[in-house]
């Protein structure tokens, strides 16, 4: 018996203006496309009987590049008015007030509950890891954003930590989060999104001590986690712009279990392959699908940082 879906991760575009060093999008995406609004409604129609409480409208693309992203957010709230809606953006596009993209961005905030600004590193390290991002373009974005009506949308900085940008964290707190009145600095240890690869190391003992002593309260993720704790297999859904269903955002390189435009989500979740992955996690005996899960690989490091 499957539990109802309470968490949805929905990709509505796979267009992106960056090639981030930690992203595997080139390995996993198909033809570039934006999901048409009629297909999007069709997808939500097939999910509306599930009690979705939280959702992320993002994936392997930059969400705001969808030409109707404000409508995407509005329509989602029509189907799931009580769901908490999260979106992440790379801030590498113009949002000057009065422009088409600027108006789309501001209109979207009427429906988004939490907006992540993805900013990893400072100047040189930022441009290195988020190539071809430009620091100057980010600053122009933030200056234009500063004067916008946020409505009731909470806005935070989401920072992916790697061994080469640890020392930039304090600068981002001081010069971005504080100056532009962002809610918090969320720190996420870099994760690997491929099924057949493990996470690289590279952190020094000094790095770990610094993160523990200064930033442990900002670091997200569970320090005590095992496969049987995975919520994705029981209550989550990850869908691509084509409608393909995958188990989670931790393994975007996996083969899909089905397609929402061909079969219902309930039928897909009953397939043998889907059930094998689910049972494997629930019994703490994971299949090859989950063998390199970064949740599992991160747990010891998060334990050290959060608990010493």
Predicted features, each with a name:
Residues 15-18, 25-28, 37-121:
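Conserved SAM/AdoMet-binding glycine-rich loop
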Residues 23-26, 249:
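Kinked, hydrophobic transmembrane alpha-helices enriched for aromatic residues
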Residues 11, 30-38, 70, 79, ...:
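Radical SAM enzyme [4Fe-4S]-AdoMet core and its adjacent flexible, acidic
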Residues 21-24, 127:
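A short local structural element in Rossmann-fold oxidoreductases
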Residues 4-5, 63, 153, 300:
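Proline-rich low-complexity regions
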Residues 1-21, 52-58, 234-243:
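N-terminal pre-triad scaffold of radical SAM enzymes
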Residues 1, 307-308:
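Short intrinsically disordered terminal tails
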Residues 22, 232, 292:
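Short, cysteine/histidine-rich loop/knuckle motifs that typically chelate Zn2+
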């Amino acid at each position: 018996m499957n539990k109802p879906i309470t968490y949805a991760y929905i990709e509505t575009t796979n267009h992106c203006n960056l090639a981030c060093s930690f992203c595997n999008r080139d390995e996993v995406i198909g033809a570039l496309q934006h999901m048409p609004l009629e297909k999007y409604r069709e997808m939500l129609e097939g999910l509306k009987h599930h009690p979705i409480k939280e959702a992320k409208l993002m994936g392997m693309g930059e969400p705001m590049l969808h030409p109707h992203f404000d409508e995407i957010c509005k329509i989602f709230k029509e189907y799931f008015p009580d769901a908490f809606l999260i979106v992440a953006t790379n801030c590498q596009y113009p949002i000057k007030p009065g422009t088409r993209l600027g108006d789309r961005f501001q209109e979207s905030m009427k429906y988004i509950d939490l907006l992540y600004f993805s900013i990893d590193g400072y100047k040189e390290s930022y441009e290195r890891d988020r190539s071809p991002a430009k620091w100057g373009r980010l600053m122009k974005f933030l200056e234009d954003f500063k004067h916008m009506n946020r409505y009731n949308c909470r806005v935070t900085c989401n920072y992916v930590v790697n061994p080469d940008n640890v020392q930039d964290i304090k600068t981002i707190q001081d010069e971005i989060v504080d100056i532009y009145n962002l809610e918090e600095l969320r720190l996420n240890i870099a994760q690997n999104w491929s099924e057949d690869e493990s996470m690289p190391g590279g952190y020094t003992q000094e790095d770990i001590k610094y993160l523990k002593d200064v930033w442990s309260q900002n670091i997200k993720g569970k320090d005590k986690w095992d496969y049987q704790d995975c919520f994705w297999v029981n209550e989550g859904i990850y869908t691509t712009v084509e409608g393909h269903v995958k188990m989670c955002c931790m393994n975007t390189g996996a083969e899909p279990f089905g397609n929402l435009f061909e079969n219902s989500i309930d039928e897909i979740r009953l397939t043998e392959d889907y059930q094998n992955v689910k049972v494997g996690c629930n019994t703490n005996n994971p299949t090859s699908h989950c063998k390199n899960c970064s949740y599992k690989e991160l747990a010891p490091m998060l334990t050290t940082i959060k608990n010493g």
